[in-house]
UniProtKB/Swiss-Prot annotation:
Source species taxonomy: Bacteria, Pseudomonadati, Pseudomonadota, Gammaproteobacteria, Vibrionales
Subunit structure as annotated in this protein's UniProt entry: Heterodimer of LeuC and LeuD.
Biological processes, Gene Ontology terms: L-leucine biosynthetic process
Highest rank taxon of the organism: Bacteria
EC number: 4.2.1.33
Identification of the protein by name: 3-isopropylmalate dehydratase large subunit
PROSITE patterns: ACONITASE_1, ACONITASE_2
Cofactor entry: [4Fe-4S] cluster
Function: Catalyzes the isomerization between 2-isopropylmalate and 3-isopropylmalate, via the formation of 2-isopropylmaleate.
Family stated for the protein in its record: Belongs to the aconitase/IPM isomerase family. LeuC type 1 subfamily.
Keywords: 4Fe-4S, Amino-acid biosynthesis, Branched-chain amino acid biosynthesis, Iron, Iron-sulfur, Leucine biosynthesis, Lyase, Metal-binding
Pathway: Amino-acid biosynthesis; L-leucine biosynthesis; L-leucine from 3-methyl-2-oxobutanoate: step 2/4
One Pfam family this sequence matches: Aconitase
GO MF annotations in UniProt: 3-isopropylmalate dehydratase activity; 4 iron, 4 sulfur cluster binding; metal ion binding
Length: 467
């Protein structure tokens, strides 16, 4: 009888090309996603050494990090952005790599574009020079971010040195209450594990609340696996996964489809497989979440008071809480709803898919954005934008006073003109609330799309359950 394995171990073992004694194993990489920010030096390295891209058919590029969301002009986000986008175009042309550039109908945030085109498939290894590559783990693929030198290594060899990680199971038992979203689930998880609780692990998310999620919701959860310190996040594929993939541009077809599904159905953790760590949450206890601090683990339910540093027994956590409250301009004991928001951002690789647009539009319909708030809706791709417009969501947003923008990473990381001014407070559907992430001295609160839209209308945080 062979040893019982976790889903992670099954995918990892199936991709080991070379495992020399005493050496880090070399894994085969099935898909390599490329964007304009972390690829220029990698292509330069190939050029210097006279190497081609080994597998152009497994390499896909797009522009997302610093594209403007107001115009398709590559000059709009400044000199550095223009150079990076022009360099990507030149590199993809020279090396024969597929590029969905700023004017292409498939352009979008790399972690939105890959899944919606069927590039992302269960059981694959997927890498990208971007920390939120974990998103693709929602399909039961092993997906993780890599550095620029590793980008060059994958371009040249289609392989990567990768040691075996520890495994963690995060089970969300039972069903969530009405109005609770995937974003609330994952923020509650990070609140429990802390922002470093998953360090050194690949996490598998499971339980009824996870199985109940759509693919969009599962992508939101896996996207933020990195925010609890994990290397990657995985969810076992099931009928929801297969229904989402079927018929997409790069999905298998005909008899290949049947064979693929047969294989994908084996991609689950064996019953008696052992995890190195197990974390359990009760879904019914999860409320709408809002971060109050400067890492995603500093999070509370919207109906809880802002915590006092004295509540933290660990001196490091206490000091971190003190610093976070000072930076965020918050007072312990008050409610987050006591503070007005200046900007609202619905978008990013965490929450910019069609389901997220629909959730925000359902809240916005027939209402008006508060007069002091600037609210941006940034679809994750041209495909999402077209779908939203076909459903009339853009009109709902514009009528309510939201700005309907072009696709890109936008205000998640302020590499274009979408950013916070010093001291501005933002309700954001993105994944990182670090100091300065959305602009120097900006104050970021992470929330779900519905919570963000409600904050835009009320002018401050509200409990979506009472909105």
């Amino acid at each position: 009888m062979s040893k019982a394995k976790t889903l992670y171990e099954k995918i990892y073992d199936a991709h080991v090309v070379v495992a020399a004694p005493g050496e880090t194993p070399i894994l085969y990489i099935d898909r390599h996603l490329v964007h304009e920010v972390t690829s220029p030096q990698a292509f330069d390295g190939l050029r210097e050494k006279g190497r081609p891209v080994r597998q152009v058919s497994k390499t896909f590029a797009t522009m997302d990090h610093n594209v403007s969301t107001t115009t398709k002009d590559i000059n709009a986000s400044g000199e550095m952005a223009r150079i990076q986008m022009q360099t990507l175009s030149k590199n993809c042309e020279e090396f024969g790599v597929t590029l969905y550039d700023i004017n292409h109908k498939y352009q979008g945030i790399v972690h939105v574009m890959g899944p919606e085109l069927g590039i992302t498939l269960p059981g694959m290894t997927i890498v990208c020079g971007d920390s939120h590559t974990a998103t693709h783990g929602a399909f039961g693929s092993l997906a993780f971010g890599i550095g620029t030198s590793e980008v060059e290594h994958v371009l040249a060899t289609q392989t990567l040195k990768q040691g075996r990680a520890k495994t963690m199971k995060i089970e969300v038992r039972g069903k969530v209450a009405p109005g609770i979203t995937a974003k609330d689930i994952v923020l509650a998880i990070i609140g429990k594990t802390t922002a470093a609780g998953g360090t050194g692990y690949v996490v598998e998310f499971c339980g009824e609340a996870i199985r109940d999620l759509s693919m969009e919701g599962r992508m939101t959860v896996c996207n933020m696996a990195i925010e609890l310190g994990a290397k990657a996040g995985l969810i076992a594929p099931d009928a929801t996964t297969f229904n989402y993939i079927k018929g997409r541009k790069f999905a298998p077809q005909g008899s290949d489809w049947d064979a693929a599904v047969d294989y994908w159905q084996t991609l689950k953790t064996d019953e008696d497989a052992q995890f190195d760590a197990v974390v359990t949450l009760e879904a019914s206890e999860i409320k709408p979440q809002v971060t109050w601090g400067t890492n995603p683990g500093q999070v509370i339910a919207v109906d809880e008071p802002i915590p006092s540093p004295s509540q933290f027994a660990d001196p490091v956590e206490r000091s971190s809480a003190e610093k976070a409250l000072a930076y965020m301009g918050l007072e312990a004991g008050k409610m987050l709803s006591d503070y007005k928001v200046d900007k609202v951002f619905v978008g990013s690789c965490t929450n910019s898919r069609i389901e997220d647009m629909r959730a925000a539009a359902a809240v916005a319909k027939g209402k008006k954005v508060a007069s002091h708030v600037q609210a941006l809706i940034v679809p994750g791709s041209e495909q999402v934008k077209a779908q939203a417009e076909a459903e009339g969501l853009d009109k709902i947003f514009i009528e309510a006073g939201f700005e309907w923008r072009l696709p890109g990473c936008s205000m998640c990381l302020a590499m274009n003109n979408d950013r916070l001014g010093p001291g501005e407070r933002c309700a954001s559907t993105s994944n990182r609330n670090f100091e300065g992430r959305q602009g120097r001295d900006g104050r970021t609160h992470l929330v779900s799309p519905a919570m963000a839209a409600a904050a835009a209308i009320a002018g401050h945080f509200v409990d979506i359950r009472q909105f």
